[in-house]
């Protein structure tokens, strides 16, 4: 009897276990999905010269669909810094899309001095290609000087080049560097014709849709609007009064005050398109036109649209971070972003695209503005001629100094020919520079280990140094100082005003929220790579922002 009961119990237990396993097998999800989950489209947006604090300085005046939507529906890495110096446009776009730094990707400035060629080299110059879409030389450009791959290149390779990559900006470098080496099309603005152009690196002729877009002659239509403030000028309480003496005037204007009259430039001076906030509207209209024309997000593979908005940089340089012009530009940009996001929702579908927005660098306050009891000033550029005289008097050699990107470059051939002591010339140069107003320090770039400066600054200089392209001595300016003789302002320093940038992600795969952990510009490409399940770019040193992953 006991044996019989035991057998019955075991049978019941076995059947129950088997049924449970069957039920479990039915509901157990597959560990490995049948296809790789990816968004239909990735949109990368770079706002040229956007300081991080602009997110919040104008927050109360933004609508709900632009910057506020990014902050409230997306993820914000609030403490994202640039890990190198100099902080310039070409360096920023390269580092965002490569996950790298100038030391590795080779883009150490907008220009740099090439000792072998004996001249300055422009970051995307390429005399081996031709302009497409114009008879000008504005299209003699390509990404050949970029020494590593971009996240856009890696996406193309990951899909055996089925994914499409389209890149657009008013600035050539703002379109070319994000697009990488393998973009299907990179388009930038030609000042001579008022049209978007490209180069034979990408194509032999412009697509029909680009010709149709150019045929609208939108710059002339924007010029007809002139530039008045979007709201009554007295409501611009986040800015200084209009028309400050340290602001630059537009060509032909007697004052820097509103309104700015652009009708005079129609059919004459197309370069002015970049200097008005409508330059951003113009670029985004082109980006919107590219989506249906190139069937972006409809190819069955993840496509990539890279958009860099340049007018914020032109306005910032001319008027400075505290101007009404700058505030008005960002209020207009906020409306443009809302329109663009709504267009993406309609054409690609909300939740079907991944979007990130960041900046290539920030900006220092105008030196004239800082005269109001704050440290800062203008470093006069006569340093170069003074140095030349000093070294000649001491060593009887003309070093033919070049000062670019805060770096001093010597003519080493002239030094060798004169049999002068290179080390002593370098030290004399450093001794002279550290005595100048506005210079915090001057350091031997090739001997950074012996330099007594904070490690954070040292790391940024090292990350910006490329052995084949960089100079001999790096000049570190005092906070708030900028090397210029003209009104307006600039950027290039290690300081937070130049290196603290927004980093916002929204849409597919992104968990809404924010973090104040320290991240870097070079972390953006690895994060996008992780979301797309593709290899990081070949020179990437960044890390994934795991806080935003769903």
From Swiss-Prot:
Disulfide bonds: none annotated. It catalyses: a phosphate monoester + H2O = an alcohol + phosphate. GO terms for molecular function: alkaline phosphatase activity; glucose-6-phosphatase activity; metal ion binding; phosphoglycerate phosphatase activity; sugar-phosphatase activity; zinc ion binding. It is a lipid-anchor; Peripheral membrane protein. Binds 2 Zn(2+) ions. Heat-labile. Activity increases with temperature between 15 and 35 degrees Celsius and decreases with further heating. No activity at 65 degrees Celsius. Preincubation for 10 minutes at 50 or 60 degrees Celsius causes 50% or 100% inactivation, respectively. Heat-inactivated enzyme cannot be renaturated. CDD domains: AP-SPAP. Subject to competitive inhibition by phosphate. Inhibited by manganese. Magnesium mildly increases enzyme activity when the zinc concentration is suboptimal. Optimal activity is dependent on the presence of 0.01-2% Triton X-100. Triton X-100 at a concentration of 0.05% increases the activity about fivefold relative to that in its absence. The enzyme is even active in Triton X-100 concentrations up to 80%. 50% inhibition by 4 mM EDTA and 50% inhibition by 48 mM sodium citrate. Residues 1-20 form the signal peptide. This is Alkaline phosphatase PhoV. It comes from Synechococcus elongatus (strain ATCC 33912 / PCC 7942 / FACHB-805) (Anacystis nidulans R2). The gene is phoV.
């Amino acid at each position: 009897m006991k044996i019989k009961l035991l057998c019955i119990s075991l049978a019941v237990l076995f059947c129950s276990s088997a049924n449970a396993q069957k039920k479990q097998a039915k509901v157990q999800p597959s560990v490995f999905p049948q296809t790789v989950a990816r968004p239909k489209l990735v949109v990368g947006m770079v706002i040229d010269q956007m300081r991080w604090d602009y997110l919040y300085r104008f927050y109360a005046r933004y609508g709900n669909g632009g910057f506020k939507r990014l902050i409230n529906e997306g993820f914000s890495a609030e403490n994202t810094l640039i890990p190198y110096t100099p902080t310039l446009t070409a360096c920023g776009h390269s580092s965002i899309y490569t996950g790298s730094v100038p030391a590795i990707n080779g883009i150490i400035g907008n220009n740099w001095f090439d000792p072998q060629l004996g001249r300055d080299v422009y970051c995307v110059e390429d005399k081996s290609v031709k302009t497409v879409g114009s008879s000008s030389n504005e299209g003699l450009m390509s990404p050949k000087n970029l020494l590593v791959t971009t996240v856009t290149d890696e996406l193309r390779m990951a899909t055996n080049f089925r994914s499409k990559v389209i890149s657009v900006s008013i600035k050539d470098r703002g379109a070319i560097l994000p697009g990488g080496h393998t973009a299907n099309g990179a388009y930038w603005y030609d000042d001579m014709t008022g049209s978007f152009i490209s180069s034979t690196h990408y194509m032999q002729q412009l697509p029909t849709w680009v010709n149709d877009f150019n045929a609208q002659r939108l710059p002339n239509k924007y010029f007809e609007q002139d530039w008045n403030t979007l709201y009554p000028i007295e409501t611009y309480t986040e800015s200084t009064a209009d028309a400050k003496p340290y602001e630059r005037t537009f060509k032909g204007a007697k004052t820097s005050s509103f309104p700015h009259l652009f009708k005079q430039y129609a059919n004459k001076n197309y370069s002015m398109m970049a200097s008005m906030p409508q330059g951003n509207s113009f670029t985004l209209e082109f980006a919107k036109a590219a989506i249906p024309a190139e069937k972006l997000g409809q190819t069955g593979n993840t496509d990539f649209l890279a958009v860099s908005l340049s007018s914020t940089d032109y306005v910032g340089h001319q008027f400075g971070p505290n101007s009404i012009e700058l505030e008005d530009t960002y209020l207009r940009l906020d409306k443009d972003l809302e329109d663009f996001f709504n267009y993406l929702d309609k054409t690609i579908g909300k939740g079907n695209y991944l979007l990130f927005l960041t900046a290539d660098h920030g900006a220092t306050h105008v030196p004239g503005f800082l005269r109001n009891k704050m440290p800062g000033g203008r470093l006069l550029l006569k340093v170069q001629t003074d140095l030349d005289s000093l070294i000649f008097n001491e060593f009887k050699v003309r070093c033919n100094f070049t000062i670019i990107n805060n770096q001093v470059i010597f003519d080493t051939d002239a030094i060798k020919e004169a049999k002068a002591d290179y080390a002593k010339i370098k030290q004399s140069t450093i001794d002279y520079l550290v005595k100048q107003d506005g210079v915090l320090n001057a350091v031997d770039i090739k001997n950074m280990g012996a330099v007594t400066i904070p490690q954070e600054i040292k790391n940024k200089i090292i990350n910006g140094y490329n052995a084949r392209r960089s100079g001999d001595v790096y000049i570190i300016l005092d906070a708030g100082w900028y090397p210029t003789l003209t009104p307006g302002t600039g950027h290039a320093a290690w300081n937070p005003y130049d290196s603290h940038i927004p980093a916002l992600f929204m849409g597919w795969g992104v968990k809404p929220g924010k973090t104040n952990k320290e991240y870097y510009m070079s972390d953006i490409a690895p994060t996008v790579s992780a979301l797309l399940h593709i290899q990081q770019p070949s020179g990437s040193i960044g890390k994934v922002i795991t806080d935003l992953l769903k």
